[in-house]
């Protein structure tokens, strides 16, 4: 079974409270999504492999730890996942960015794919999938399935908030994919929205519906 990590750092919780507030406008919401993603990325990358290298300092030659040469790809689920990308890129500026376009059918609540563009060497990369909301889990499950069909093997899922139902669904469908969240909320309502949630992340990020 995959590991579920709730990253409850005080700065993350503080910013998340502002993001939940319906009075917070798109500009501030967008900035805080990026900031929280950057703070979360510290924990999401904790288990990346290191290797020992020899470095010459101004004083002497010494051995240091560096990332083990494994390439990283950030794959946002469009459109809301885009809001988290720059925060992760600030810590991993050499990462490539793929895109998976999925939207949720409001009647069936099922995800529908409309776009997919990934790095050609996706099978060699350590992948961080970003999506602010893990509600039913349908979009995340489909995005991860698509990545695996393209050869991806090393995948982490990074969300701002999630419902227990969505977390359980992803774990059942992809028990090898670890999940990282800033908050595990109470439940889904009858419309499939996270409670208490923060509204529609895409709408609030971009100021459109």
From Swiss-Prot:
Q: Gene name?
A: upp
EC assignment: 2.4.2.9
Question: Reaction catalysed by this chain?
Answer: UMP + diphosphate = 5-phospho-alpha-D-ribose 1-diphosphate + uracil
Which residues hold 5-phospho-alpha-D-ribose 1-diphosphate?
79, 104, 131-139, 200
Q: What is this protein called?
A: Uracil phosphoribosyltransferase
- Write down the InterPro entries for this protein, in alphabetical order: PRibTrfase_dom (IPR000836), PRTase-like (IPR029057), Upp_B (IPR034332), UPRTase/APRTase (IPR050054), Ura_phspho_trans (IPR005765)
* Keywords on record: Allosteric enzyme, Glycosyltransferase, GTP-binding, Magnesium, Nucleotide-binding, Transferase
Gene Ontology MF terms: GTP binding; magnesium ion binding; uracil phosphoribosyltransferase activity
The family annotation for this protein states:
Belongs to the UPRTase family.
